[in-house]
């Protein structure tokens, strides 16, 4: 990236590693009983004879629940840091931390997607791509499909195949098209295997999603241009939807193009690249015509649904 796009090494690294080191994990603090119930019960009897009411309340609650939310203990039981420190020094309790993953995706109302069967044309497109993938050096794939032809269903089928091989997938979608409805289709099909990043998320939320990817907790990352640098260990597929969109070209140094960078990452990691558009960019279409890309066409809308009607209205002279 530094050599191809004329940037410094620092600029290239900041692009590839977009999450700053100063972002820390979000954790929840817990107080846990660290002695036996018998010893705790004996200690509670002793404390009840003293004036240490806060210690008594905390120990009584711990004997019932064994593990308490630190915030709850402070608010509801009046537990202070001095009480916690004293119990820690005496070996009565220990402090534990649970990591909390930050996310802006509300998945509560997302149910499983009704699986739509592939049309004959979509099935033929998938088989054509699969034949290309069996070659020693498969080409990037460009799907030219009219609006509503079901390119996303083809992507999902190819992602399913990739995941069945134990590999991971990245789906690039322009920020303007990264809507709840778009994300919902992937989440409804793949569930918790999917994560999303976008520019509206906080740095902490993005940090957590990249961390989940690095740990292997997810297998599909959906997002704009920056999602290309998701730290997957075994990347198998990169999908670039609406590849003609100008937002795939970075306006900041290094001024890389996501399409070219995706193809290079795929080459380095032995992954596959699939691009799709109803109106492919001149560059991509030229590469396809020259045989550098495999061109796959979807000419019919799904279930032969008609295109929306368009009317031309003359508004001149109207208020």
Enumerate the language-model features and the residues they cover.
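Short, basic/glycine-rich phosphate-binding loops at helix/coil junctions
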Residues: 309-313
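Cys/His-rich short segments
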Residues: 316-319
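Accessory, non-ATPase domains that flank or precede helicase/AAA+ motor cores in DNA-metabolism machines
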Residues: 1-277, 284, 289-305
């Amino acid at each position: 990236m530094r050599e191809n796009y004329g940037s410094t090494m620092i600029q290239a690294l900041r692009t590839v590693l977009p999450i700053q080191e100063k972002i820390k994990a979000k954790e929840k603090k817990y107080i846990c009983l660290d002695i036996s119930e018998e010893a705790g019960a004996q200690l509670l009897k002793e404390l009840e004879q003293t004036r240490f009411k806060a210690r008594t309340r905390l120990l009584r609650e711990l004997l019932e629940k064994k593990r308490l939310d630190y915030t709850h203990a402070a608010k509801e039981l009046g537990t202070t840091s001095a009480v916690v420190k004293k119990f820690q020094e005496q070996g009565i309790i220990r402090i534990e931390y649970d990591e909390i993953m930050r996310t802006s995706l509300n998945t509560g109302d997302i149910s499983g997607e009704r699986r739509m069967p592939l049309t004959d044309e979509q099935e033929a497109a998938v088989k054509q791509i699969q034949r290309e993938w069996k070659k020693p050096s498969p080409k990037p794939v460009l799907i030219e499909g009219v609006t509503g032809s079901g390119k996303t269903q083809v992507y999902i089928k190819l992602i399913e195949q990739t995941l069945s091989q134990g590999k991971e997938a990245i789906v690039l979608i322009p920020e303007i098209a990264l809507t709840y409805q778009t994300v919902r289709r992937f989440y409804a099909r793949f569930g918790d295997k999917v994560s999303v990043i976008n520019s509206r998320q906080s740095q902490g939320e993005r940090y957590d999603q990249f961390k989940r990817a690095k740990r292997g907790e997810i297998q599909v990352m959906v997002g704009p241009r920056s999602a290309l640098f998701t730290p997957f260990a075994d990347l198998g597929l990169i999908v670039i939807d609406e590849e003609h969109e100008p937002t795939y070209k970075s306006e900041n140094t290094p001024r890389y193009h996501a399409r070219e960078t995706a193809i290079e990452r795929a080459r380095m990691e032995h992954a596959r690249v699939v691009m799709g558009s109803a109106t492919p960019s001149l560059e991509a279409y030229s590469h396809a015509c020259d045989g550098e890309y495999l061109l796959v066409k979807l000419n019919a809308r799904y279930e032969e649904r008609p295109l929306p009607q368009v009317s031309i209205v003359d508004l001149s002279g109207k208020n």
